[in-house]
Amino acid sequence: MEETLVDKKLDLIAKPIKMKNKQHSQITNMPYVKHILFVFLAMVLSPPASSQGKELTWEELREQYEFPEWYTEARFGIWVHWGAQTQPEQGGGWYARHLYMQDVGKQNWGKNAYSYHNKTYGHPSEKGFKDVIHEWKAENLDTDALLKYFKKLGAKYFVALANHHDHFDNFNSTYHPWNSVNVGPKRDIIGEFSESSKKYDIPFGVSSHDDRFLHWWLPAFGADTSGVMKGISYDGHMTTKDGVGKWWEGLDPADLYGLPPHKRTPEWIEKVKENWMLRHKELATKYDVDMLWFDGYGFPYDSYGKEVCRTFYNHNLRKTGKMSVVVAGKFKDEPLTVKDIERGGANKILLFPWQGTLTMRSWFYKTDEHRGFKHNARTVIEMMTDIISKNGNLLLNVELLPDGTVPPDHKVILDDIGAWVNLNSEAIYASKPWNIYGDNLNSYLKHSMEDMNEADLEALKKNATSEHFNERTLKDPSYGPDEVRFTTKGDLLYVFVLNPTEGVIALPLLGLKSKHKVKKVNSIRLIGSNDNISFEQSAHRLILNVPAKRQNKYTAVFEVKGAL
């Protein structure tokens, strides 16, 4: 059980106080000592300042904060990167931006957006992203069913997208009219997910990607550079007057797209930042979220983002008497935050909690022909294994369909992942890293050298030592059959054989003379089986037999007793 602040203070009181001299010791006989002790107890046992109404500063929060166990022990969470940009079947994850670009340049993931939009919705001078939002109904969204399913898969926390770069809020925002209650689904999506998370006792987080708003929408103020519509302004230039008699009457496109570039004054930009802050303070407090996750390499809008986080922590402290929430993002050595690594993982064991985010295909669900699966159950499980061996959590995106349901072909993969997680749960949840995360590291490179040119090999080596976007996909060579990862729990060591094949593997790090001070192994068991596994331990290696018959075809996990 987690030691509370009160427990620590009581422990402090219970310890004997060493007096410097006899004169000091005589005060214990004085009548007023009871009064002093009473005051002292009142001080140390009083709740944190924020729970009494005083807002703690960032520095004061740093002194008190500890990462909550629900997060550090979770190891596996599920995220739905789902919003209005899912509505178009094609066009990539930046559809709202790319629909206004005849030429997307190097951003080739959005190359179909402009043509698809013209064919499906009309020309962006009349029908822009505002009209895509209007078409999005989320008609089959059942948040209870989704949370029940995600919990069955073994997810220990859940995250929903609150807004994307498109500046559209998936919650009932007091400060932003372009939200899912006013437009599109006419539902408080975050509110529904929040209630279902509580119902199924799963910590709930929200992701925000809106701090790119100021530059992300600039193409909406352009026009075609060629063709019959050349020079006709896109709908970013529309005003409230243009909406009279239309479905969006009363709404101002400028609240969604921003002002045209030539009208953006420093004062207006400050108002945008202040509005962002108000929206996100409301998001964090109204829905009592357990995690705020920002898609950026620092606090959104600097001090504004930091103030949102300060409010978030204080709200949690005031309501529960402790800080049990998490702020995550692509931070670098930022106290009170979890480091997030997009589509990849750390290249070493990190001392503090972190998470790797992954998706099987694209972030938003798309059917573009050039967008096949990057991952299947095998590669996701391998990524999860690598991440938890380095003290991280895997946050896996589930690409919901526009109607709010899980695509059937994705469900097949998710079911396989869930079966593996549930089978090997003892080696996953609440596990800790060992002295080193793995053995026979990058042995696959030895097997790849015969079939790959020098440039490809160098790219693989670089990928193995990077972080963001270092994911190993279906296109990459498989792990060598002897490459393993480690986790621990108590006095047990768990060995994850990433790409198991029948036969023996040698693990040098588990020899009796290993620099990691390995003890004599007593027994080895394949999780999912009651049969002991044959092995041989010498001074320089542990030889482990991987059986052909296993309950699951993916990464094989062995419980090793005695080594630690």
What positions do the PLM features span?
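Short linear, low-complexity motifs centered on an aromatic residue
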Residues: 1-6, 95
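Short, positively charged and aromatic/hydrophobic N-terminal segments
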Residues: 15-18
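Bacterial N-terminal signal peptides that target proteins for export
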Residues: 20-37
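Sec-dependent N-terminal signal peptides
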Residues: 36-44
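N-terminal signal peptide c-region/cleavage motif recognized by signal peptidases
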Residues: 46-48
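Mature catalytic domains of secreted/periplasmic carbohydrate-active enzymes
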Residues: 52-564
